[in-house]
Amino acid sequence: MILMGFSLLCWRKLITRIRPAEQHDVQAIASIYVDTWRSTYAGILPDKVLIEMSTERQMVMWARAIRHAGGHAEEKILIIEEEKAGIIGVSSCGFNRDRNSSYSGEVYTLYIHPNHQNNGYGEKMLAGLFEIMIDQGYNGAIIWVLSLNPSRFFYEVMKGQRIGEREEKLWGTVVREIAYGWSDLEGALESGRPQLS
């Protein structure tokens, strides 16, 4: 009986909802963004950059991004809410900013709060983005990830193919980025990874 109650509690904890981001979400989104960057990029990006990140500045940036996405059919911002914890992740997608790429869609961001990672929320968010891009007629999608970002292996688990590398300069630090691509978004959804349920 105790085990049954424990299982029910665990199942209830995973009840989630994915929806478009709205202006009243900006504080939660900004907090997730700052906390995730500080957790993920410690030792990768300069400490000064991470220390000086502020929720207030990110709120302004995300408010602008949500306004833009609301009036721009090609760009979407999604949040994921957990029943009790509230908003625990944010993601965005749209057209591939590299117009010469054979992948027409791009995942711009996918952040799950550090306290809620490794619980399947990233899979649900990625699936939600793929569904949007399928609806918009994109033939595939890419995401660029810092090579030293430990979360990049998530995209390999999600069947993303390593399709490119580049070097960028961020805050005076040269970093290497890796591109992961999915050439068949419908196939990626049907394969069971990523999946919504």
Per-region residue spans from a language model:
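Conserved N-terminal entry element of GNAT/NAT acetyltransferase domains
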Residues: I2-Q27, E186-S197
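Acetyl-CoA-dependent GNAT
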Residues: P20-H24, V34-I44, V49-N115, L126-G128, ...
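Residues at secondary-structure transition points
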Residues: V49, M53, E75, S102, ...
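Conserved catalytic-core motifs of GNAT/GCN5-like acyltransferases
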Residues: I142-L146, E156, Q161-A179
